[in-house]
Regions:
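Basic, short loop/linker segments at the boundary and entry of helix-turn-helix/winged-helix-like folds
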Residues: 1-42
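Short helix/loop capping segments that flank catalytic or ligand/cofactor-binding pockets
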Residues: 18-21, 51, 120-122, 185-187, ...
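Conserved beta-strand -> loop -> alpha-helix junction used to position metal-binding or nucleic-acid-contacting
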Residues: 176-182, 186-227, 289
Length: 373
């Protein structure tokens, strides 16, 4: 009892209770909201579903057989204790609830957009084949700190995917920074009729990389060559850009710089336009690229098993939440309890978004072969 006579229950203590008693938990679940939150935090921090499931079963006193199993064909299977379906179901059901409690529903003033792809091994293909891609957006709030504001897995990166992604939130950003190509072109189409339309800015790091890759191979490897300093400074002012152009033009007479000359010529109007714009806001998609590198380390080894779009999106939201510094076991447990209270204790039905056999939602489906009549 509190001082004003209101009865309270501790949501964190875990005493041994009768089967009809216990801590707040989703109906028909054998685990409490606190344990679900603990599992979600572990997954957000990069733990696998299997390791998380084994830990949760152990700490709750619900261990399963920890001996390796074999299938009917003799294939070695993971122990039942490590079966990850338990945690995978929780991620699908509760990750969107956690994300919606923190993430903004509107685009911020400054926005970074880009995509990255995940590949899987394929016999006969040295680089494997593309499994799926991830679209990402980092926004800058009033404190000018970058935060992931949207992330989505797609089977293929095309204009339709980017249009749906950029229309997923309300509002219009004031500045959109991208590597160029499809993301910025689609942003121009989506936001062009908004008033005022956003400024579109090419990422300076990608522009510099394009220039560097156009150099002869030996010059690319020689980081002491003066031209690398000129490239680094080229986007700071019009005279710096002209100095780089003059140096490339001078070297063209010796051979091997034709590609660099074409590149610096084609990028000149882009750089000139950006130099004429206000200097406010980010100039690189670096914060988003950093998140993509972390994703590659976390999801790369299991990309071949990620075939369901809804579940992949839920996992991405947890990983993004951790990147934003939102992971908090106690706060997440409170969010889950509040959600369950509103739903009379019922969590959303698990496995609502299963794929039909042979039609994984996170894979590019093969084009149908025309049949002659």
């Amino acid at each position: 009892m509190t001082g004003d006579g209101v009865e309270q229950a501790c949501g964190e203590c875990a005493t041994t209770l009768e089967p009809w008693e216990g801590q707040p938990a989703p109906r028909l679940y054998g685990f409490t909201a606190r344990h679900v939150a603990q599992a979600l935090v572990m997954v957000a921090c990069g733990q696998s579903y299997r390791r998380t499931a084994a830990t949760i079963r152990q700490v709750t006193g619900r261990p399963l057989d920890d001996r390796p199993r074999r299938s009917a064909t003799g294939q070695v299977l993971a122990p039942a204790q490590q079966h990850g379906q338990l945690v995978s179901d929780w991620v699908e059901v509760f990750a969107p609830i956690i994300w919606s409690a923190y993430a903004s529903a509107r685009w911020p003033q400054w926005l970074l957009i880009d995509d990255t792809s995940f590949r899987i091994t394929k016999p006969g293909r040295p680089r494997g084949e593309e499994a799926f891609s991830v679209l990402g957006a980092v926004g800058y709030g009033p404190d000018e700190r970058p935060q992931l504001i949207a992330v989505e897995a797609v089977p293929v990166v095309d204009s339709a995917a980017w249009q749906a992604f950029l229309r997923s939130l309300k509002g219009t950003p004031g500045l959109v920074v991208g590597a160029g190509g499809l993301p910025l072109a689609t942003a121009d189409r989506v936001f062009a009729r908004r008033r005022p339309p956003p400024e579109l800015r090419r990422c300076q790091w990608h522009l510099a990389r394009n220039l560097t890759k156009s150099l002869p191979d030996a010059v690319q490897r020689d980081r002491t060559d003066e031209i690398h300093r000129l490239i680094a400074a080229a986007q700071s002012s019009a005279p710096a850009w002209e100095q780089l152009t003059a140096e490339i033009l001078r070297r063209t007479s010796t051979g091997g710089y034709l590609a660099a000359l074409k590149m610096v010529t084609s990028l000149r109007p882009v750089v000139a336009h950006q130099l004429a714009q206000p200097l406010l806001g980010p100039r690189s998609v670096g914060p988003l690229e950093q998140f993509f590198r972390e994703l590659s380390a976390s999801l790369g080894p299991r990309a071949s098993k990620m075939t369901n779009k809804v579940r992949a999106d839920a996992l991405l939201k947890l990983l993004a939440a951790d990147r934003n510094g939102w992971t908090d076991e106690h706060a997440w447990a409170d969010l889950i309890r509040t959600h369950l209270h509103r739903q009379q204790g019922h969590a959303r039905q698990q496995r609502e978004h299963t794929d039909s056999s042979g039609s994984p939602s996170l894979r590019r489906l093969p084009k149908p072969v025309p049949i002659d009549a």
